[in-house]
């Protein structure tokens, strides 16, 4: 299920972010060859940051370990001018001192009344007043909902489009901008950013932001240079298809002549679904009308590779469910490293049932109806396999570029056609490819090594999670090939993969490739993050991101391929959330600090590169000016232990928090398997608005089933989604209801997508005992309505687990009737969580005589709810509905009497 993050308007974004399919950005994913550790033997992230002398930061709103307002080390500080501080006036100090005495008295009274909860372990040693909790921000004005929704609080984050130089040059990046003396598209050395006056303009690939073809000027939608920088693949007039996929007309742009020609001269207007360069820059493979084609650059002839593509058969691209739930992209074509073979997925969905999506206000198909039919809805039918329905049948095929043969390789002992998922394809050498196959319920994984030269294959590893712990295998795209290098102590090929060790996800190094027992690179009661690691091949060093310090944090670490010398590359003495990306050759790195303080990004040279370089590329100065204008809530990170499982909690307290006052509490959650909502990222979102402006406490707990807490806590939810997760929300709410500053009669819960399901499931399970209100947006209400690959991973098939599906569905109308009131909102054109879910629930509510709920429907909106101002309307409705709940307005509505 693609997540919809309820932050900074992110509820409007589907659960996974969109990505450009041919992006040249490498985020901790590339094989490196460096001469040393990332920041040097004596250079950790703190030292790296200090060399820039970034100015001091105003303390932000994160409270940890009872110390708030204490300046972080430079690694956590944000560049800003001290002169911008404007709240040190004499009168404020006088008033502050007067208030301090009153606060101390209130503080003593509060602690005298406080109930000790043995099941809660808080990282806050004391309750802080608003000033100490939020620093200068508590003196500002309340947040506005518009400022949250319009992106004013969005953090700017840059991705570096690193590109490999044709002759092995490192530190090259792709720049795309406006027309000018430097050109529209150019390859630039990172060193040119350091001294722009002396540096050249790099290699200009496209001088203008338009291309002339057939007497017309065309505007590029996307551009992808060839590996040798002599040509550019240009997509024009891109039209979105599903979450990641789109179609466009494609052109080959010659850098030398600055002229363009159609990718397929015989079909210049043909809508192409996917195109990608050969590693040798001599050919482009592309999919059109679900068939695969090859265009060599030394000819205008296009070779058709497949001929069976059509309505039910896809070649080289995924269908809806594989794009959504397996690859997270529109790509199912993989060139071999030497450009002699193309691996591609063939998908046959002829047995997959169609689901109709109706559009009442718009024409997504682009077709104009015949006269007299204008008032009928536009209907789009999507092959959507629901739980228990037939899945698409997938096979991996190969194309030999020289012989033009198309073939597949049968490996004995495989899964049946209706029980096979192909989840990952990684070329391991010029002729060998690693393939991961899952069974339908995603609890048995076969790793297969295929040799396309001999057209043979072997199963090199089988992981049976059903037997091991009763859990599931998550789909990953992070397997990394490690080539043999006897001179550097690697006699055999190998690969990195995430393995389960003592109940936690860790990196393992399998060498030789057919070895089923890995060298453990990491271990311990914490987990690595599922992103491809960067590898220094010369020195045998792996760079990775992990949660070693806390599930809510991300730090960068290095470890040798033999599992020794594990080191932190960022400052782990302070709470932090980091990301990192490396240049192709490993000479440069982009370190991104994402929280809890103001995010920043910095480029540096790594020790393998003796030429010093460092540049702060993003400081997010606008956020500093924003936090000085607005009062923001304090964020207090805590732990709660339920059934001997420790869970992460964050409590957002309103500015000027008064410990002797009673506050309503809103719980916000997502809660899907493997997800995370409690983290140390900087975020000002709808929850911040609710706390800052509406004055309510907002609590989030990552319950069982969520990510980075170990498999025991994660996999317990299998087969009965919603039960344990709802219990964790209820038990946490009970603990908060006992707090002296909480109004236990005004506790609500809300969420979107899986969070919408969890909202309803929690209200159903609690039956009004703890929660009185709930707001569910785009909720799943019965897992038999959701797609098969996601659902069966966590629930098994309906045939295997009919009781589990019955229990997980929202079905107890009597229990829902015990709540004061709840709200349901859904887009009618939701192609992810179908509107059918809400309609089915409403039918149950009608049959049960339940009336204590409201429904808001958004015509033609998909899962993100954006169409025709719907995005703003969602949050306006959430906000006003919540105010009515916490001011007892819904009590009056619920007991309304007929006029006499």
Curated annotation (Swiss-Prot):
Sequence ranges of Low complexity compositional bias: 24-39
Biased composition (Polar residues): 44-55
Localization (cell): Vacuole membrane
Membrane topology term: Single-pass type II membrane protein
Protein keywords: Aminopeptidase, Glycoprotein, Hydrolase, Membrane, Protease, Serine protease, Signal-anchor, Transmembrane, Transmembrane helix, Vacuole
Region Disordered, annotated ranges: 1-83
Active-site residues, record numbering mapped to chain: 753, 830, 863
Aminoacyl-tRNA synthetase in keyword set: no
GO molecular function: aminopeptidase activity; dipeptidyl-peptidase activity; serine-type peptidase activity
Catalytic activity, reaction form: Release of an N-terminal dipeptide, Xaa-Yaa-|-Zaa-, from a polypeptide, preferentially when Yaa is Pro, provided Zaa is neither Pro nor hydroxyproline
Gene Ontology biological process terms from the UniProt entry: proteolysis
Superkingdom of the organism of origin: Eukaryota
EC number: 3.4.14.5
Positions of transmembrane segments: 91-111
Cytoplasmic domain ranges by topology: 1-90
Glycosylation sites (chain numbering): 150, 195, 348, 410, 514, 639, 644, 812
UniProt-listed Gene3D superfamilies: alpha/beta hydrolase (3.40.50.1820), Dipeptidylpeptidase IV, N-terminal domain (2.140.10.30)
GO CC annotation: plasma membrane; vacuolar membrane
PANTHER family in the cross-refs: DIPEPTIDYL PEPTIDASE 10, ISOFORM B, PROTEASE FAMILY S9B,C DIPEPTIDYL-PEPTIDASE IV-RELATED
Function of the molecule: Type IV dipeptidyl-peptidase which removes N-terminal dipeptides sequentially from polypeptides having unsubstituted N-termini provided that the penultimate residue is proline.
Name of this chain's protein: Probable dipeptidyl-aminopeptidase B
Organism placement in taxonomy: Eukaryota, Fungi, Dikarya, Ascomycota, Pezizomycotina
Name of the gene encoding the protein in the UniProt record: dapB
């Amino acid at each position: 299920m693609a997540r919809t993050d309820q932050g900074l308007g992110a509820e409007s974004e589907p659960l996974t972010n969109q990505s450009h399919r041919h992006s040249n950005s490498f985020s901790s994913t590339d094989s490196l060859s460096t001469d040393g550790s990332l920041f040097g033997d004596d250079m950790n992230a703190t030292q790296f940051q200090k060399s820039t002398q970034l100015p001091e930061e105003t303390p932000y709103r994160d409270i940890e370990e009872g110390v708030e307002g204490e300046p972080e080390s430079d690694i956590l500080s944000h560049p800003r001018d001290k002169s911008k501080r404007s709240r040190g006036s004499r009168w404020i100090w006088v008033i502050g001192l007067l208030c301090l005495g009153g606060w101390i008295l209130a503080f003593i009274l509060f602690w005298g009344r406080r109930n000790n909860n043995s099941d809660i372990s808080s990282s806050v040693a004391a309750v802080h007043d608003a000033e100490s909790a939020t620093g200068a921000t508590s003196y500002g004005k309340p947040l506005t909902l518009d400022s949250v929704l319009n992106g004013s609080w969005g953090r700017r984050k840059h991705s570096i489009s690193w590109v490999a130089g044709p002759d092995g040059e490192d530190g090259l990046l792709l720049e795309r901008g406006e027309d000018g003396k430097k050109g529209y598209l150019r390859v630039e050395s990172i060193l040119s950013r350091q001294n722009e006056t002396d540096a050249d303009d790099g290699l200009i690939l496209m001088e203008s932001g338009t291309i002339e073809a057939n007497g017309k000027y065309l505007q590029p939608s996307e551009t992808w240079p060839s590996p040798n920088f002599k040509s550019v693949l240009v997509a024009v007039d891109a039209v979105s298809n599903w979450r990641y996929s789109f179609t466009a007309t494609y052109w080959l742009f010659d850098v030398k002549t600055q002229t363009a020609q159609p990718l397929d001269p015989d079909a210049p207007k043909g809508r192409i679904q996917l195109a990608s360069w050969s590693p040798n820059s001599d050919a482009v493979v592309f999919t059109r009308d679900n068939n695969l084609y090859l265009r060599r650059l030394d000819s205008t002839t296009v070779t058709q590779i497949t001929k069976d593509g059509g309505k039910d058969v896809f070649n080289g691209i995924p269908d809806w469910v594989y794009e959504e739930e397996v690859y997270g992209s529109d790509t199912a074509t993989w060139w071999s490293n030497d450009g002699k073979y193309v691996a591609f997925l063939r998908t046959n969905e002829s047995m997959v049932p169609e689901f109709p999506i109706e559009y009442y206000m718009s024409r997504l198909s682009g077709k104009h109806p015949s006269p007299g039919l204008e008032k009928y809805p536009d209907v789009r039918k999507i092959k959507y396999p629901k739980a228990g329905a037939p899945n698409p049948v997938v096979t991996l095929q190969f194309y030999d570029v020289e012989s033009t043969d198309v073939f597949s390789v049968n490996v004995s002992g495989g899964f049946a056609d209706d029980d096979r998922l192909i989840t990952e394809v990684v070329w391991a050498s010029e002729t060998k490819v690693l393939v991961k196959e899952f069974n339908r319920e995603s609890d048995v994984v076969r790793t297969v090594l295929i040799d396309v030269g001999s057209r043979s294959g072997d199963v090199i590893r089988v992981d049976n999670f059903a037997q091991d712990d009763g859990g599931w295998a998550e789909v990953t795209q992070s397997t990394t090939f490690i080539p043999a290098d006897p001179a550097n102590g690697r006699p055999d090929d190998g690969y990195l993969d995430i393995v389960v060790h003592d109940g936690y996800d860790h990196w393992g190094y399998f060498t030789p490739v057919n070895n089923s027992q890995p060298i453990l690179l990491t271990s311990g009661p914490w987990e690595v993050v599922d992103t491809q690691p960067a590898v220094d091949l010369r020195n045998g060093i792996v760079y990775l991101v992990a949660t070693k310090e806390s599930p809510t944090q991300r730090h960068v670490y290095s470890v040798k391929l033999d599992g020794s010398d594990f080191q932190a590359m960022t400052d782990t003495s302070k709470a932090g959330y980091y990301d990192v990306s490396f240049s192709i050759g490993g000479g440069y790195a982009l370190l991104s600090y994402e929280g809890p303080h103001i995010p920043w990004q910095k480029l540096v040279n790594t020790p393998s590169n003796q030429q010093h370089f460092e540049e702060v590329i993003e400081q997010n100065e606008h956020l500093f000016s924003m936090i000085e204008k607005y009062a923001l809530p304090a964020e207090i990170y805590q732990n709660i232990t339920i059934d001997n499982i420790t869970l992460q909690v964050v409590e957002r307290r309103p500015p000027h928090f008064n410990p002797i006052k009673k506050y309503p509490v809103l719980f916000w959650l997502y809660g899907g398997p493997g997800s995370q909502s409690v983290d140390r990222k900087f975020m000002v979102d709808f929850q911040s608005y609710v706390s800052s402006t509406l004055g309510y406490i907002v609590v989030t707990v990552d319950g069982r089933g969520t990510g980075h807490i170990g498999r025991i806590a994660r996999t317990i939810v299998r087969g009965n989604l919603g039960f344990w997760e709802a219990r964790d929300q209820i038990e946490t709410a009970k603990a908060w209801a006992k707090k002296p500053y909480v109004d236990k009669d005004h506790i609500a819960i809300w969420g979107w997508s899986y969070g919408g399901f969890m909202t309803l499931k929690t209200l159903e399970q609690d039956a009004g005992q703890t929660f009185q209100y709930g707001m569910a947006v785009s909720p799943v209400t019965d897992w038999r309505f959701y797609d098969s690959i996601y659902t069966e991973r966590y629930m098994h098939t309906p045939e295997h687990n009919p009781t589990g599906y019955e229990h997980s569905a929202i079905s107890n109308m009597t229990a829902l009737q015990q709540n004061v009131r709840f709200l349901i909102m859904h887009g009618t054109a939701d192609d992810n969580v179908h509107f059918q879910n809400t309609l089915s629930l409403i039918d149950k509510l009608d049959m049960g005589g339940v009336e204590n709920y409201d429904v808001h429907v958004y015509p033609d909106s998909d899962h993100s709810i954006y169409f025709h101002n719907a995005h703003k309307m969602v949050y306006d409705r959430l906000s006003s509905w919540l105010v009515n709940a916490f001011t007892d307005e819904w009590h009056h509505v619920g007991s309304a009497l007929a006029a006499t």
